[in-house]
Amino acid sequence: MISCELPTAARSLMVSRNYLKREGKMSKTTARRQRRIYALLMVSCAIPSLAFAEISAADTEARRKSGTDDEVVVTAEKKVYQSVKAAEAVKYGNAVQVVTADDIRISGAANFAEMAQFLVKGVNVGYSPDEGEYTIRLDGGGDRDTLVIRDGVPLYDRGPALEDIWSSTTIDPHMIERVEVFRGGNSLFYGSNGGIGVVSLVSKKPDGTRKGEFGISYGSFQSREIWGNYAFPLDAEAKHSVMAYGSMQATDGPRIYNPKDFVDNVAAAGGVQEYPLNRNDIGLKYLWQIDKDTALRINAEYTESWFQDAFPDREIHSPNTVRYPIIDASFEKRWSPAIMTEVAAYFTNPKIWNTELYPDICKVPAGCLNPATNKTVPFGSYSGKVFPNGPFRGFGTSNQPRAGFKEMGMTVRNTVNIGEYLEFVAGLQSVKYQDDSAREFPVGNKANTTTGVFVDLRPKLPFSPDTAISVAVRTDFLDGSDNKTIWKLGFKQPVWGGVYVRGNGGTSYSLPRTTELNNETSTSVGNPNLIPEETKTYNGAIGYNGQFKDVAIALEVGGFKTEITDRIQGTTDFRIPAGNGFPARNTFFNNTALTRILGVTADVDVSVGRNWRLSLGYTAQDASLTSGLFKGEQINETPAWFINGTMSWMSDDQRLNLVLLPRMQGSEWSTGGLTVAGRPSIRKNFGNYTVVNATVNYFMGDERQHQIQLRIVNLFDEKYAERYGFGNQLYGSAFNRGEYTASSPKYFFGYPFEGKPRSFYVSLSTKF
């Protein structure tokens, strides 16, 4: 696992000699055991991240002038800023990776999912980045236990009625100053939903100086983008400054589904289509640098995205509009070298509007008249008409009400250093959210409030001053009389000659979403009896940091163990009987079987002078239920192993830069179809692929402030699937003619969400 002290991924090469081999004749237990043995043997030669921290007085003064208490880490001729939280996490045994704005810039990533897939180690992206719907999953976790936050604002979908909002899709990668990735349980400071990890985005901010950025891009699928930001002081002393920023992105999008996978009547009604995606945002940031140790920041932004999410088995037209306002503020005060206070608050109110049109099917044996052609349509075929999916997915004010939620929160965090032998962090966090959907939706707007208090004790051992120990506990007071107490332990011990040992562990929980508790639609019913998921995770590693002349290397090999109880899942067997005008529907339940995830990690970073950067991140994850029908089977959408990273070369004059970004992964499964004796009949492995992106960057100007970039996505044109879904023949002609029933294997089918084919993009950007 990578620490904050390591060099960043965009300046590195990921070279993999690791692979997992599964013999088809092996038992599942033997295969998993051999997979772990292969991983342990073969990753032992990996070399991960650089760590040579040094904070100078000049850096400290610059930090204070900018109104931040970020730490400065010097890694192989490059300074990397990181938050106090990240620096402390590394010190006390956590695995933390920092991805900088320069890393993102030379990668050319068009959205946050593309950035995370190739630059963030341990990440698997859920759903499809090209469809406008995706989530970030760390170390075998799911959407619920990897928390993405931006400047302290959680981008977690609380479950509005109608449709998921996919909050991470609103992120503009050009406005990211750095990404801090906390692997392992991190709910202590961040609250619910950080049970397996936290991906913290720190955005670009005003700092009292005059500066700006501007860029444009054009490429395959008529993709075009324009972005920029400009910051300037409001007074001569630069105590007050602002930054205005915004971007616009639009693309016709690549093909998502193979036309052969569409149900015949869906295709006949126009379901085979492009998948355009549009996103635009605008915002304003303000800094009041009260004095060198005190700063107040305020940000307001508004993002709108528009995308299609029609599927091959039903929708022929399904545009979504998301509008996402965010207001956040932070106050930082360093009272003395030993005491610091941080206060952060936010308010969000995302909303979504959704249209879903389905094909009308001729149910008359003698045939139907197509109103557009005045021709007779055969029995079971598309009639020429369409209808909205229920009363809330139409076009106008009468049949397209909004869905959404409101959320607000505040965190107060105090860091205190008491003398020579004790440091502690103490604070509180309060979060309140409620559904904000139109009254037509049967969800209710009851507010859910969680208030937590936490303390993190960091004793210093007089007999071992280099040993770092953290013992922390947090209690959350939920609505009613319920409360949750979680804990976290961490340590880091230097051994000798750059070798160290680290480890941490803790507990967390994840609350049910609003719609999982209360919603009622034509396909699903909420379950008010759901209880929170419980997560327990441990991870540890042994590492080495060293430098030999102009070659800097580091090694870390580790592992993790995660156990999830009462995991919240959706049914697939329509266990809610038909009634009240509804067909049979699905619901949600707590899976009583324990989910266990065992993982092996290895990270490598090598820096050779100012020319070469090589990086490697390897994660193997054996994730399965420990009992029941699916005992021992890899859980869905969790790769058995994967490797991601970069290889970067820079010319001697620091003008020409070549970058390769590979991602290689093993098996990844999806399960669905007809359920027989409690087991879905289709289990599809859609993994086992290698995708390589590449960029050519050329920097111009006296300060290399102008950049032209050629980006090639999927350099070798690999055919692969980002996701694998399942559909049925409800709108198929043969089914509607009665040739088979919904209990026939013919009724169900699977289909891949295709990965982006080889494509090209050119961008021009400048800093001023």
For each feature predicted by the language model, list its residue ranges.
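Conserved C-terminal beta-signal and adjacent last beta-strands/turns
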Residues: 31-32, 36-43, 53, 231-235, ...
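A beta-strand signature from Gram-negative outer-membrane beta-barrel systems
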Residues: 170-213
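Flexible loop and strand-edge segments within Gram-negative outer membrane beta-barrel domains
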Residues: 251-256, 273-279, 293-341, 345-390, ...
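Membrane-embedded beta-barrel scaffold of Gram-negative outer-membrane proteins
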Residues: 338, 342-356, 494, 501-502, ...
